[in-house]
């Protein structure tokens, strides 16, 4: 009896919140209400919630859309000045309905099919299938299988200490003829220039080089490193997990609190890491807010950026083509106060990254030294690398 595809999808009230739905339905049906402003969450799922409520109430009244990027009074006033038309929001509404119905169709049909398949030998083995959960589970299973198939293999490295007039330095033996080999069409991560797969060979290299003089070839190159891009939700969650051990759920909750309760951050559920091209004046105002905020770990850097005119229209920051419904997560014009320790950590991550993208690139001097140790016409190469920070640039914001 598969597939199960209903001619239409019926909506039923959620018992727990049915009283609220009745109140909204009553308000929508009031005769003195001639038009409706949809102020649900500015995203796909917020659009879906409004459409479901309006559909359940049978409302045909004209609709305008309030689209907020932040919850500050100024942003809310600006949102009411620039209400979007209902026609403009139809593609987003269609996408939301499509997602909702696809979840149901994939879930009911996939679960019934896989449950039947896994129960064909007897018994009942419920096997849930979901549009998102099943592909995600497949990724985890694939990774687990790779881990199970992994066979540990010993390798050796030869490290040497060389003495020169200025002092000692360490070099690591490398195969100067090494070329990255392919395994199943992909580069084999186990193969590296410094790895020796036989202990006898490693001992032989050590014996031939120990106590022997070497010839040094040295090259120094200046390099620059730009700051990472502004945060979207995913990159913020990764950074917070790496630095503080916060789960993705915790980071979202903290960012949502900073957006809704404290009005200190812009809309967090964004997939963009850029800003609109006309947002330069707002960015300057945000730097001014940070400079005057009294946040001693942030204010001096904001002041430097303003005094040095760092805030300008940078293509890697301002790009309309890479801004969807929402732009990157940045501080609002409202200085934060009364934050919890965890909220302060998230705010600092966002604020530092926000300032960093406008600061100059960090400048380093990278030195590579190759020491050749010869024996009976055979040279062994030892590589030493050093990196010196010349100008910190944006890294000064992080105390470097």
Go through the PLM ranges and name each one.
Residues 42-46, 69-75, 162-166, 271-274, ...:
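Conserved nucleotide-binding/hydrolysis micro-motifs of P-loop NTPases
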Residues 22, 31, 73-162, 214, ...:
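C-terminal or mid-to-C-terminal helical accessory/interaction module adjacent to the motor/catalytic core
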């Amino acid at each position: 009896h598969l597939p199960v595809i209903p001619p239409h999808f019926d909506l039923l009230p959620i018992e727990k919140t049915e009283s609220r739905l009745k109140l909204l339905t009553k308000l929508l049906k009031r005769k003195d209400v001639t038009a409706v402003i949809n102020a649900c969450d500015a995203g796909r799922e917020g659009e879906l919630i409004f459409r479901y409520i309006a559909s359940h109430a049978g409302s045909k009244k004209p609709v305008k859309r309030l689209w907020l990027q932040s919850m500050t009074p100024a942003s809310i006033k600006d949102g009411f000045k620039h209400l979007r038309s209902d026609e403009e929001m139809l593609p987003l509404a269609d996408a939301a309905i499509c997602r909702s119905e696809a979840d149901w169709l994939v879930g009911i049909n996939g679960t019934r099919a896989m449950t039947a398949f896994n129960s064909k030998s007897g018994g009942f083995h419920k096997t849930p299938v979901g549009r998102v959960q099943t592909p995600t589970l497949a990724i985890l299973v694939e990774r687990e299988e790779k881990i199970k198939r992994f066979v540990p293999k010993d390798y050796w490295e030869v490290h040497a200490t060389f003495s020169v007039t200025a002092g000692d330095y360490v070099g690591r033996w490398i195969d100067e003829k090494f070329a990255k080999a392919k395994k199943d069409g992909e580069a084999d991560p186990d193969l590296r220039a410094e790895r020796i797969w036989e202990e006898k060979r490693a001992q032989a290299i050590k014996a031939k080089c120990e106590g022997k003089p070497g010839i040094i070839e040295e090259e120094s190159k200046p390099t620059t490193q730009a700051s990472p891009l502004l945060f979207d939700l995913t990159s913020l969650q990764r950074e917070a997990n790496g630095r503080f051990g916060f789960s993705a759920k915790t980071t979202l909750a903290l960012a949502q609190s900073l957006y809704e309760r404290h009005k200190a951050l812009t809309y967090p559920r964004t997939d963009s890491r850029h800003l609109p091209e006309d947002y330069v004046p707002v960015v300057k105002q945000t730097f001014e807010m940070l400079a005057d905020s009294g946040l001693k770990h942030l204010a001096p850097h904001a002041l430097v950026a303003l005094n040095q005119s760092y805030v300008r229209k940078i293509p890697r920051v301002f790009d309309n083509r890479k801004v969807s419904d929402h732009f990157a997560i940045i501080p609002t014009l409202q200085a934060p106060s009364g934050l919890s320790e965890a909220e302060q950590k998230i705010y600092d991550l966002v604020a530092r990254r926000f300032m960093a993208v406008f600061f100059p690139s960090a400048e380093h001097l990278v030195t590579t030294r190759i020491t050749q140790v010869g024996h009976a016409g055979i040279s062994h190469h030892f590589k030493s690398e050093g990196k010196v920070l010349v100008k910190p640039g944006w890294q000064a914001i992080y105390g470097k």
